[in-house]
Amino acid sequence: MKIVFAEWGGFGNEDVKAAFVAEGHELIRFLFPAQYGRHNRDAETENRLSALFRQEVPDVMFSLNYFPVISRVCQQEKIRYISWTYDCPCFLLYSATIINSCNVAYVFDKQLYLDFHCAGIETVRYLPLAADTERLDRITIKRSGEQSFQYDLSFLG
């Protein structure tokens, strides 16, 4: 399958790309810097993405997190848009574009999925977060002479 992958500096880009390649999919990078119109229309982004779709003729568009501007172009060009949102709350999911028929918008928060489902929105689905366990298994942890922890508990994220 030919997948256009929106790269915008999100967490997990490398893991997801590696998983797609390992499954034999062809990836086409679409650079999507944070300053581009993620909330509203952005003519430059829309034009670049439309041109890429016409040149590459992909099977699907994929992004980590949901972006209305991408959905808008995918709807226009009749390309399936798959997003996997790991931010919560992700206010971009509440865009009117979420009901576009091109969308398959996965969220890791089951209650958020249920909220959309109960509202009759069928384009949002539930999918837990994932990690590249092979990559994580290669991380070495300092054992001998390691420094004791300064605190009993730390919060990350």
Predicted regions and their residues:
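Catalytic core of nucleotide-activated saccharide and alditol-phosphate transferases
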Residues: K78-G157
